[in-house]
Amino acid sequence: MTKSIIREIGPLALNFQDDKVLIFFGDNAPSELREYSIIHDVEVFNQNDFSAGAKLVIGKYVYEIEAVGGEAANNMSKLGHLVVYFTEVPDEILPGAVYAAPHIFPIVSNGEEVLITL
């Protein structure tokens, strides 16, 4: 299981609702990206969780991970960085991306858990 807690929601982080994208970063997010990011504390990390078929839980929302880019687990491990797309999986998957279904943009709040588990 991978577990994090949402600590801060950048003032522009939810501006990507129409594109159905959430950007997560650890507390060390670069200042120019912090305002666009969901800042979270990664409490538990398991690289094996980053695979198609795993569950992604954000607060009360439950998703199935459909595809994972080759750098997503590494980015999460080192930077707390994760980009989640609630869209159809494209032909070319971005290296740091996770694609989740259903394709519904979640409402997020400070203090909520984010879980990834097989």
Show the residue positions of the predicted features:
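N-terminal disorder-to-order initiation segments that are Gly/Lys/Arg-biased
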Residues: M1-S37, E112-E113, L118
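Helix-rich interaction surfaces within compact, conserved domain-sized segments
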Residues: F24-F25, E88-L118
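Short, structured beta-strand/loop micro-motifs enriched in basic residues and often containing a Trp
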Residues: L33-F45, D91-A100
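Short, conserved secondary-structure segments in the cores of folded domains
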Residues: N46, A52, A72, P102-I104
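Short, well-ordered loop/turn sites that connect or cap secondary structure elements
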Residues: N48-S51, L56-V57, V108
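Conserved "cap/hinge" positions at secondary-structure junctions
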Residues: G59-K60, L118
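Short, conserved beta-turn/loop elements at beta-strand boundaries and strand-helix junctions
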Residues: Y61-V62, V68-N74
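Short, solvent-exposed secondary-structure boundary/capping segments
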Residues: A72-V83
